[in-house]
Amino acid sequence: MVSLEARVREVKGKREARRLRRNGEVPAVVYGPATEPIPVKIKRSVLEKVFHTISEATPIQLIIKDDQGNTVSEKTVFLKMIQRDKVSETVVHLDFYEPTKGHRMRINVPLKVVGKPVGVEKGGFLEVFHEEIPVETDPDNVPQEIEVDVSSLDLGDVIYARDLKLPEGVKCLLGDEEVVVSVLVPKEVVIEETTEAEETAEPEVIRRKEEEEE
């Protein structure tokens, strides 16, 4: 679990949000089924140290303090939304979701692809259609990643959502026939195979014609 410190944000509004960003802080909000929205702020320098280790499925221990440094509350939350500047890609706002025990939640879990497909050795290439898998689960049963082994995939082979192995109690929200991973056949391979087939078929047609003339 990642630990993150935040301060209560007393003043709200766009002007205050801009001021915070100029001062090296990121405005955020904490909310949930049983939680009234709590505006907070986080030091950008603190956020940058852990940001690369956090996904939507990562439980975060959020320690909320007042401006005097006194701890107001500690919550287990999940990073639900990241807003970035359209030009600089800088993080400008965060949404943290606090689930309620016994209340199932929807969350995106990173897909971890392991192995090298047989089809890639033959000239194909691996296409991952879903980097994250949307699931429904209990808050205390959130998988950190969903692993899929692609070693046995040959040219044209597909792994569907129904093929994913999920922990008990975790439900995939993709349709059963949704393609998750596939080994695609390069166009040049298809063209070569088609050309060879045409060349093989042509003499047969000529021979049949000669036989008919005889």
Curated annotation (Swiss-Prot):
Residues 194-214 are annotated as: Disordered. GO terms for molecular function: 5S rRNA binding; structural constituent of ribosome. SUPFAM superfamilies: Ribosomal protein L25-like. Gene3D superfamilies: Ribosomal protein L25, beta domain, Ribosomal Protein L25, Chain P. It comes from the Bacteria. One of its GO terms (biological process) is translation. This is one of the proteins that binds to the 5S RNA in the ribosome where it forms part of the central protuberance. Part of the 50S ribosomal subunit; part of the 5S rRNA/L5/L18/L25 subcomplex. Contacts the 5S rRNA. Binds to the 5S rRNA independently of L5 and L18. Belongs to the bacterial ribosomal protein bL25 family. CTC subfamily. This is Large ribosomal subunit protein bL25. It comes from Thermotoga petrophila (strain ATCC BAA-488 / DSM 13995 / JCM 10881 / RKU-1).
